[in-house]
Structures are given as C-alpha cells and as structure tokens.
Amino acid sequence: MLNDLAAFTEAVLSSRMDAEWSYDQKSGRFRDEKGRFLSKEAVEKLVDKRIDKVEASLRRYTRMLIDGAITLDQWQGSVRESLKAAHIQAAIIGHGGRAGMGSAEYGRIGQRLREEYAYLQRFTSDLLGNRLSAPMALARIGLYAQSVRGSYWQGAELRQQQQGYSLMRRILDSQAQHCQDCLRYAAQGIVSLGTLPLPGQRCECGARCRCTVRYFRQQPATVPV
C-alpha cells in the first residue's frame, strides 16, 4: 500500500498548472497552449480546477488514513507535499510565471506554508486525540486545499501593482453564498489598491471565499478646455 500511495502522490505532484498556460510579459496577459489569450476568468478557473484536484487528493489520503491503509506519518507527509506543490504553483500563476518569482516571492510562500503546516500539526493532534469523526476530518482537510487560492491572489495583486494598477474592486460570485464581510467589501466599489483584503482574508468565508478581484489603472484627470 505504501508503494501505491507513493505512486499516487507522484502523479498528483507532477500535475503542473503551468503546463496549460504561458505569460506574455509585453501584454501582461496569459496565453493558452495554442497561444491564444486567456481571459482573467479563464485563468481563475484554471486555478480552481487545480484546487479541486488537490482537494480530491487530500480527501483520498484522509480516507486511506481512516481506513487504516496508511499511517498518520504517511498521511501528514503526503498532505504537506501536496500543499507545498499547490501553493507554489498557484503563486507562480499569480506572479505571471516563474520569471516573476524571486527570493522575496518564494519567501512569502515559505511563510504561508509554515502557517499551513502549523494548522496541519494541530489537525494531526486532533486526529491523534480522536477528537474528529471521519466526516469532520474529510470536511476539514478540504479547507487546506481551498487555502491555495490565497497564494494565487497574493501573487496576482503584487503583479498588478508592478504593472501600474492602483485601483481594485471586490467581485462577488453570483453562484455562491457570501458572508456579510464580503458583501460589505463588494459594496465599496472601486477603491485604492490595498484598501480591501484579498479573498479569503478577514471574512467569515475564510478559505471557502469565492470572491474575485478586478484591478484598474488610475485614469489621468482631464482638464476642460
């Protein structure tokens, strides 16, 4: 069973999000594998698709643990490796490719991963203490996959700022239920970049937040003639 787990983990980690896109530095836009420009919505769906795959893999690891097919150490190691790969990949998309990633960017991802690993350690302690039922454990592990979206948004905001965007607007997902915090952020309309927290931050939705952000450049003031 350990060999099966290792093979499955390798397959998950080898599924790279950046195999489906490239970033055009000149236009500041993404292209698909055929060279066609991708919309912002398409890029976000690409991230969501990868997160869904990560969540499925984390749930599978957790079911294997519940069924006694793997040990707690094996489960924790597989979860850590999956989260590490997914957060790095999401950040790379957010920053517009590996060329946009420097030591500072990798440092921010490292800090984020340390926080996630600390949460995971508490999760492990709860499992050891038999404080979680199987449904509770499966629901909780899903939140770790959803947290990957935050690494994308962190990178995207920095990239947009570097490209001269100075305004932002929170956009609600019409298909999702939003908390009062997110409704309040969206109601503020277009504001200065950095005024609003990124999706998943400072809101009751947390990692499940389905908001997006759109960025705008400040239009120069016109003087009437």
PLM regions with names:
Residues M1-R208, R214-V225:
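Domain-core detector
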